[in-house]
Amino acid sequence: MHFTYCPHCGTKLTEKGIGDEGLIPYCEHCNVPLWDMFTTSIITAVVNEQGEVALLRQNYVSTTNYVCVAGIMKLGESAEDTVIREVKEEIGQDVEKLEFIKSYPYPKKEMLMLGYKATVQKKDFHLSGEVDSVEWVKLEDAPNKLREGGIAWQLVKTIIERS
């Protein structure tokens, strides 16, 4: 989010040079810089002990490609707690091990996605209402089912390269 007006007092912002950051939106009335903001979210490749990854169909996200478990961090929640919660909520799996992979800027959605690999013991899926279907796919086959170049694709490719 890029501020044009101060969210505290409503004054139209000016720009002020701040150190190495360059020109930053600034409220002369409140004497505060207003940095651009973004939503922080997680994306995780859920991998079982057989080397399979859970790929989801969420028609509100894409009707043509599979996706990975993803979600927005709640206020006061760590990224790791968000991964554990989202994996349980969306597909009913219990995370046994977490590994941070990489952060992914997503400018189109004004988002920063924190990418993880979540290891689980394979069990039956229990889907939330926002998941249309899910299936286990061999990790090496997963990129072919994801949108090439997309964040889920990049995450899975990085995990494969590190294996």
Short names for language-model regions:
Residues 1-61, 72-124, 163:
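N-terminal leader/linker segments that precede catalytic domains of diphosphate-processing enzymes
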Residues 1-2, 14, 63-66, 107, ...:
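Nudix hydrolase/Nudix homology domain
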